[in-house]
Design a protein with these regions (language model features):
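Extracytoplasmic/periplasmic solute-binding protein
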Residues: 153-169, 179, 195-243, 249-250, ...
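Long, aromatic- and glycine/proline-rich binding clefts that accommodate carbohydrate-like moieties
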Residues: 313-318, 365-419, 423, 451-453
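Hinge/lid segment of periplasmic solute-binding proteins
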Residues: 37, 111-167, 311-319, 384
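Short helix-initiation/N-cap motifs at beta->coil->alpha
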Residues: 83-94, 192-197, 269-282
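Glycine-centered hinge/linker elements that transmit conformational signals in sensory
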Residues: 199-204, 239-271, 315, 319-320
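Short, solvent-exposed loop/beta-turn-alpha elements that line the ligand-binding surface or hinge
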Residues: 130-143, 187-191, 232-253, 302-310, ...
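Extracytoplasmic/periplasmic substrate-recognition and gating elements
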Residues: 47, 71-72, 77-79, 101, ...
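Conserved N-terminal structural module of periplasmic/extracytoplasmic solute-binding proteins
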Residues: 2-123, 136-141, 324-325, 346-347, ...
Length: 453
C-alpha cells in the first residue's frame, strides 16, 4: 500500500481520515516479528549509534530501550545524547546545527506536526528507509494508517511513528467544581457542548483570587482547534494563507476567547500559571484547554497525590461537532528517523523498530510521558491498563487533519502565533480586539509568505 503525504496537508487524502475509521491496514505479508521489535540477524558488530532526542529524557524510558536493545545486540552501543533546549523548536534548531557541523546522531526525529519533516527531507538530513523496510519484511500495518501516513513524502518512507494524538481537542475539567455548582457534565465522549455553554461555565466556575474558570494556552495547537470549534480554520489546507480575518467563523472564535480573557478576565494571563496540569491538579483552574495527554496527566497527578474525588476528579469535555460531521481536533504525530549517510543504517533501523514497536510504544506512553496512540496493540494495552484511554478513541476515529506551512517555516510559524496571540489576550496591557487580531494575522501571513526554509 502506498502512503502519500505533502507538507501542505499532511493528513489530507489518507484513507483513514477520508473514511473516518481508526483501522490498521490489512496485512499483505507476514512481518519479520509480530510486534515491530528487532531482528537480531540484521545488525553489524561493533557498531555505535548516537541517539539525539528530547523525548522521554529523565523518565528512564530511553535508558530502558537502550538496555533491552543491548541484550539483543551485545556488540552494538547506543549513545543517548539528550537535547535540552528551552523549547521543542530550540531542539530542532540544535539538530540542524549539529547536522551542519557534521555531528548529528544516526537516530534523530524531525516531526511532521512541528513542521520540520519535509524540511529535513529537502535538506537531505534524513534518509528514506523503504529498502530497509522491504529487506526486513516489516509489516507497516502494525501502526495505524493515519500515523504511518505521516512517515511518507513524495512516495518514499522516511521514518516510523513515535507519538500521535488528536491535538488540543478537549477541555480537561475538574468534575468536583462542576458538581459543587450543580452543573451536569456531558459524557466524556460526547460532542454536544457548545462553545457558548463553555463560556458560560467558565464565568460561573471562576472565583476571583481563588481559581480561574478556564485556562487556555497561547500556541499553534490551540489556535487551530479554537477556530475549528467555531466551524472555521486558522490557515488553509495549502498552508499559504492565514484565514482569521477572511473566515467569519474564525474571527468569531477569537472574539469569543478575547471576551473571556480580556473583558471577563476568567482566563489567567501569561505567566500566572506555570504548568497547566499542575494548576488544575491543585484546583487553581476548573477547565484547561488541552488534549488527551493532559487528561491522563491530571488523572495521574490526582492519584499520586491521593486527592479526594470531592476535591478534584478529572473529566473530559470534547469540542463540539462541526456542520460537516467532523470533530474539532487536529490530528498530530511524530517520527523516528535515520540520518542521511549513516554508516550503519541497517543497525539503526533495528533500533528504530525497537523504540517504535509495541513494547517501546507502551513504555513511551506509560514511562516516557508522551501520548502515542499510534499502534492498535499498544492502544489496547493502554485501555487495559486504564480504561480512561477509551475516551480518546472517538476523536481519532473522526478527527481533522492538520495543515502545515507550505514553506516548512515551522519555528517562525509557531513563534508568531504564540507571540501575537499572547499580545491579543493580554488583560494587563489591553490591545483593542481588531488591532490585536490584525497583528496576529499579518505576522502569521508574513511567515507563510517567506521563501522555503
Amino acid at each position: 500500500m502506498a502512503y502519500l503525504t505533502s507538507r501542505r496537508n499532511f493528513l489530507k487524502g489518507t484513507m483513514l481520515v477520508a473514511a473516518g475509521m481508526l483501522t490498521a491496514c490489512a496485512p499483505t505479508a507476514a512481518p519479520s516479528t509480530s510486534t515491530g521489535e528487532s531482528d537480531s540477524s540484521a545488525t553489524a558488530e561493533g557498531v555505535t549509534l548516537r541517539w539525539d532526542t528530547f523525548r522521554g529524557i529523565g523518565t528512564g524510558w530511553n535508558e530502558e530501550r537502550i538496555d533491552t536493545f543491548k541484550e539483543l545486540y551485545p556488540d552494538v552501543t547506543v549513545e543517548l545524547r539528550p537535547l535540552a533546549g528551552s523549547s521543542q523548536q530550540d531542539n530542532y534548531a540544535k539538530m540542524y546545527a549539529a547536522h551542519a557541523a557534521g555531528d548529528l546522531g544516526e537516530i534523530c526525529a524531525f516531526d511532521p506536526s512541528h513542521f520540520h519533516f519535509w524540511r529535513a527531507i529537502d535538506k537531505d538530513i534524513i534518509m528514506p528507509i523503504d529498502d530497509l523496510v522491504s529487506a526486513d519484511g516489516l509489516d507497516v500495518s502494525e501502526w495505524y494508517e493515519i500515523f504511518m501516513g505521516l512517515q511518507f513524502h513524495n512516495g518514499k518512507q522516511y521514518g516510523l511513528p513515535s507519538w500521535g494524538w488528536s491535538g488540543w481537542d478537549t477541555f480537561v475539567a475538574n468534575a468536583a467544581h462542576f458538581k459543587a455548582e450543580g452543573i451536569e457534565l456531558p459524557e466524556p465522549t460526547s460532542h454536544s457542548t457548545s462553545m457558548e455553554t463553555i463560556g458560560e461555565w467558565a464565568r460561573q466556575l471562576h472565583r476571583e483570587g481563588e481559581r480561574f474558570g478556564l485556562n487556555v494556552g497561547r500556541a499553534e495547537p490551540g489556535a487551530v482547534t479554537l477556530t475549528r470549534a467555531f466551524g472555521g480554520d486558522f490557515i488553509n489546507a495549502e498552508g499559504t494563507k492565514c484565514l482569521i480575518l477572511d473566515d467569519a467563523n474564525a474571527t468569531e472564535a477569537f472574539r469569543w476567547l478575547y471576551t473571556l480573557a480580556v473583558e471577563d478576565k476568567v482566563i489567567p494571563s501569561v505567566g500566572s500559571v506555570e504548568n497547566a496540569d499542575s494548576a488544575q491538579t491543585e484546583g487553581l483552574t476548573s477547565m484547561n484547554w488541552g488534549g488527551s495527554l493532559n487528561v491522563r496527566n491530571v488523572k495521574r497527578n490526582i492519584e499520586s497525590q491521593s486527592i479526594a474525588p470531592e476535591v478534584n476528579e478529572v473529566w473530559q469535555i470534547l469540542l463540539p461537532e462541526q456542520a460537516d460531521g467532523k470533530y474539532a481536533s487536529q490530528l498530530r504525530g511524530g517520527t523516528w528517523n535515520i540520518r542521511q549517510g549513516a554508516a550503519n543504517a541497517d543497525t539503526a533501523f533495528q533500533f528504530l523498530k525497537h523504540i517504535a514497536g509495541k513494547d517501546g510504544t507502551i513504555g513511551f506512553n506509560l514511562v516516557g510521558g508522551n501520548f502515542a496512540a499510534v499502534r492498535p496493540d499498544a492502544l489496547q494495552a493502554l485501555v487495559e491498563q486504564d480504561p480512561i484511554h477509551e475516551w480518546f478513541i472517538v476523536n481519532l476515529e473522526n478527527g481533522q487533519p492538520a495543515h502545515a506551512p507550505a514553506n516548512s517555516r515551522g519555528r517562525e510559524f509557531t513563534d508568531a502565533i504564540t507571540q501575537y496571540m499572547t499580545l491579543l489576550l493580554d488583560a494587563n496591557q489591553v490591545t483593542p480586539f481588531e488591532e490585536g487580531l490584525q497583528a496576529l494575522h499579518d505576522n502569521v501571513q508574513m511567515v507563510l509568505d517567506m521563501d522555503p526554509a
